[in-house]
């Protein structure tokens, strides 16, 4: 391991240890509510509406490009922004899961294997996100967690897909 990377790693471990110790030493109940996650909203659409109308109503900018948008969700694209593939989504605000739904969804059996609840109107079984939404309350709560949702340019959301965050070389 490169010496500077080793030093960075050691500082990171020390910081995590200090944070963990600080949390453990915090007054009883102090952090329990902070780390619980969403226990209220099961509707992804309702969560998006609450964020739009009650949280970011006075600061409407997209996450990655800092592009402003109005109450009608019209985006002022930043200078130089172009897309060849997702043109219909370029001027549209969408809500991005910072941790992609697939990354937590694939741990649910309904996502991987389906559920008896998941059949279409012809009786054909289905699985994946649609099945997890329909049949698993924990998935719905996670999908609707407002700490994981941010407004983005639709074309950027489409391009990112379910990829994790990472560092890009300049």
Task: Report residues per predicted region.
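Domain-level detector of nuclease and nuclease-like folds
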Residues: 81-170
């Amino acid at each position: 391991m490169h010496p500077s990377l080793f030093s960075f790693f050691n500082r990171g471990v020390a910081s995590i240890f200090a944070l963990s110790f600080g949390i453990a030493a915090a007054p009883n109940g102090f952090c329990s509510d902070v780390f619980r996650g969403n226990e209220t909203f099961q509707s992804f659409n309702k969560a998006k509406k609450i964020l739009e109308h009650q949280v970011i109503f006075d600061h409407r900018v997209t996450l990655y490009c800092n592009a402003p948008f109005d109450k009608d969700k019209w985006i002022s694209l930043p200078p130089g922004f172009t897309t060849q593939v997702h043109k219909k989504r370029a001027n549209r605000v969408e809500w991005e899961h910072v941790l992609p739904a697939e990354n937590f969804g694939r741990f649910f059996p309904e996502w991987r294997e389906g559920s008896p609840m998941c059949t279409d109107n012809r009786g054909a079984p289905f699985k994946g996100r649609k099945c997890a939404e329909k049949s698993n309350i924990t998935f719905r709560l996670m999908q609707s967690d407002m700490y994981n949702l941010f407004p983005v340019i639709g074309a950027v959301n489409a391009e990112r897909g379910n990829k994790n965050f990472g560092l890009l070389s300049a």
